[in-house]
Amino acid sequence: MASHWVGTWTATPAPADGVALSSPTIRMFPRISIGGDTMRIRLSNAAGTGDLVIAATHVAKRGAGAGVRPDTDRVVTFNGSGSVKIPAGAFVVSDPVSLTVRPLEDLAVSIHVPGEIPASFGVTGRYARQFNYLSPPGDFTGMEIMHASRVIDDWFFLSGIDVLAARDVGGIVALGDSITDGNISTHDAFCRWPDQLARRIVTRGGKMFGVMNQGLGGNRICHDIRGDSGVRRFDRDVLSQPGVTHAIVVLGVNDIRNRSGRKEEEVTADDLINGLNQMAMRARARGIKMFGGTITPFENETFMVGAWSPERDARRVAVNEWMRSAGAFHAVIDFDKFLRDPEHPARMLPIYDNGDHLHPGDVGYNRMGDVIDLSLFD
């Protein structure tokens, strides 16, 4: 059967503000969604202001702690070379790597970045909601047990892992903000709603889909913050993902909250509707089935005190009603309906609330993954 590349794991490239590095090996532990016998690694210098040199990259199956299983360790090359130079704003894709991996397996990707990288360079990263590791200066990419000088909560430079899959295997991209990224969920518990979606697809069996989490904390539809806005990054983070057949967009709450606090960045419901409609049309034009996720309630949130108001909530309600009725998306996933308090729809039901009244907790994130109708992907 013919095969093609499908994304099995992603991390949205964004600026890791204030991060400086001193010739470390970075060991990170992504959990993939689908398996395969051949993979490739994607590294990004999206936030960099100059060339980024990666001196060595290894991939293996995870061992204990910061370790790897040495029998699975593979050297990753780029056009036959163990090192690669990535221009500012660019990314690179590795040569194919022969390693058989199972769905939902934990991998270890180790990269060595030589020399001093000051904070002014612009390190590319994203919050991980799990423990990854930095070494003292030196190349420890091939070591089974890497001495860690620092525990980090980031993905540095690693932006994707693809597997070679049968032609009938599809890809689902989750485009969102911190609620998609699983902010404030338990570390190393894999409680993000895309994690739960991936588990359900694997458990169901049958037709398989890679699940690519392109959540980015603080992200908005209309304005940049901590990286590109939803409409700006849509081509890179959705349309260009290997094997993508379906996408779910869950954005808008940070626009309504005015996460930046700038008066000139206040938005109307129509602004958000226009942005969402653009994404839906662009996906359809590429043959991708696009699903809209309604905006969840956030009355009296404490993450950014004063961000909620009745007037802002009215915008949220208006956008959600448009999503449900306009037919712009192939289907709507009504996260608002499933998470809100039926007795008080402007707020999240306490069992799903992590306590800041904006982000779900582990139970809420798993609920989001559970309410997605898997028949949407048939």
Locate the predicted segments by residue.
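N-terminal secretory targeting modules
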Residues: M1-L175, S185-D188, T203-G206, F377-D378
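Short, solvent-exposed loop/turn and secondary-structure capping segments
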Residues: A119-T124, N183-F190, C222-R226, R259-R262, ...
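Short amphipathic alpha-helices and their capping/turn segments at secondary-structure boundaries
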Residues: S159-D168, A189-T203, R226-G243, Q278-R282
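Catalytic nucleophile-elbow at a beta strand-turn-alpha helix junction centered on a G-D-S/GDSL motif
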Residues: V169-D195, G217-R220
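Structural recognition of the beta-strand scaffold that forms the well-ordered cores
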Residues: G171-G176, T180, F209-G215, T245-V250, ...
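Oxyanion-hole/transition-state-stabilizing segment in secreted/luminal serine hydrolases
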Residues: S185, L216-D271
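Catalytic His-Asp segment of secreted/periplasmic serine-dependent ester chemistry enzymes
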Residues: V231, R257-R259, T296-D378
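C-terminal soluble interaction/assembly domains
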Residues: N254-N258, K263-N277, R284, F291, ...
